[in-house]
Amino acid sequence: MSNEVKTINEFVEKYNEFKNEIGKVIVGQDIAIEQVLISIFCNGHCLLVGVPGLAKTLLVKTIADSLGLNFNRIQFTPDLMPSDIVGAEILNANREFKFIKGPLFSNIVLADEINRTPPKTQSALLEAMQERSVTNAGKKYYLDKPFFVLATQNPIEQEGTYPLPEAQLDRFMFNVVLDYPSYEEELE
């Protein structure tokens, strides 16, 4: 058996192990689990669309734990500023500026309710997604590798939101629509 075939078989085996491990915690969202894992392995990002209570945060946390990756959750709100997610320079005791990294400096970032924050902050996140780096005070800072964003949106509440334009939606590999689990899955 060639090395390529062996590598592919090992990958498939590991992928199935991850999927089964995550499925022990997240029930009834098999397609979402598949798409999120594929997106991570392909160095992409995901947008999850679903009402509250469908275990979106638990899904991301479980995936991060099973892959052994760092995880940060950012709750997007109307008053969130780009520096709140990117980080900022502060003056230290030696009167020198020091960059303090924001929550974007993690392997997996949950951008919860991305459409609740103004376009300026959305743009800072989308720049990080595209460039895998952020800019602060004219300096470029590279993000941790791997870097994966899972953003969520609530499809019901549209009042007080800032919809993502088509060009920004294009940054996501998958737009995953989550639905309620079946009665049998709920019992499980």
Show which residues each predicted segment covers:
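Conserved alpha-helical scaffold flanking the Walker A/P-loop in AAA+ ATPase domains
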Residues: Q35-I38, L91-L110
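Walker A/P-loop
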Residues: L37-T77
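Pre-Walker A (pre-P-loop) alpha-helix and adjacent loop at the N terminus of AAA/AAA+ ATPase modules
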Residues: I8-L54
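Conserved AAA+ ATPase "SRH/arginine-finger" region at the nucleotide-binding site
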Residues: Q75-L80, M173-E184
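Conserved NTP-binding/hydrolysis module of P-loop NTPases
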Residues: M81-R95
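P-loop (Walker A) phosphate-binding loop of NTP-binding proteins
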Residues: V51, I85, T152
